[in-house]
């Protein structure tokens, strides 16, 4: 990411994107990790896990894929999207394409 892109990311832009995606993204739960060994190993007082496995695509990558798909100009949507992945990103990209009718 170049500096211009990074400078354009503001709290307001994050909140806008959250609102834009919220109707299509699952609000997944977080659970507190109760393993004393891992808490000791990581040197943390508390650790929470975000259960993104409950997301429609089974991964947090759905957020990014849908965010990008929503930014595709209308006249370019007829070309669809391509994802170079054999894993979570490809699954999320396919899901985002379906949601956005690409």
Feature annotation, model-predicted:
Residues 1-102:
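PLP-dependent amino-acid enzyme catalytic core
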